Amino acid sequence: MLKKRIIVCLDVKDGRTTKGVKFQNNIDIGEPVEMAAEYYRQCVDELVFYDIIASARGRGPILDLISRVASQVFIPFCVGGGIGTVEDIRSTILAGAEKVSLNSQAVKNPSLITEGARIFGNQCIVLGMDAAKDDEMPSGYRVYINGGRVKTDLDALAWAKKAVDLGAGEIVLNSMDAD
């Protein structure tokens, strides 16, 4: 039997942790370094940190914040948001992340998954996928990017399979309908 794991996802916007409902109306709920440290003290198994506006704003990861979070948690730490190049992957890992989550940038440039897996190993490459119900899609779910703001033509199941074939070692599925 598989062991159940508690994985906490922190959505970060403008350097603050936020909480929204169905990817909308995010409100400030705290300072991300303090929240990460508190979850670590509560013995969560893994921490996922999403900069939910980096890709939409066309900027890279916030390395200083990643480094400060990494200094407080000693569990697997995955970071997503604004990671669009191999150098972004490298700098995010050097800042303290053990894994990177590729979402919008992977849709725009699927070879980033392959290159990242080749250089850093597929255990470091996580496909982050925001999906919502859509009867037009073969699986019944459509992929969205840029924090759920932009609809794609990708079927969620087909994209997940392709990402694994490209080298993604894990998938984090964010259900926009159940968020």
What is each PLM-predicted segment?
Residues Q42, Y50, Q72, A95-G96, ...:
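Structural motif
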Residues E46-D64, S104, V172-D179:
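Glycine-rich, proline-tolerant flexible connector loops at the mouths of alpha/beta enzymes
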Residues D28-Y40, G84-R90, T152-K162:
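Short, acidic/polar
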Residues A70-V100:
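Catalytic cores of alpha/beta
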Residues R5-D11:
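Short, hydrophobic/glycine-enriched beta-strand segments
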Residues V12-D14, T18-K19, F23-N25, I93, ...:
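Conserved anion-binding
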Residues C9, A56-G80, S111-D130:
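Alpha-helix-loop-beta-strand connector modules within alpha/beta enzyme cores
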Residues L2, T17-G60:
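N-terminal beta-alpha supersecondary unit
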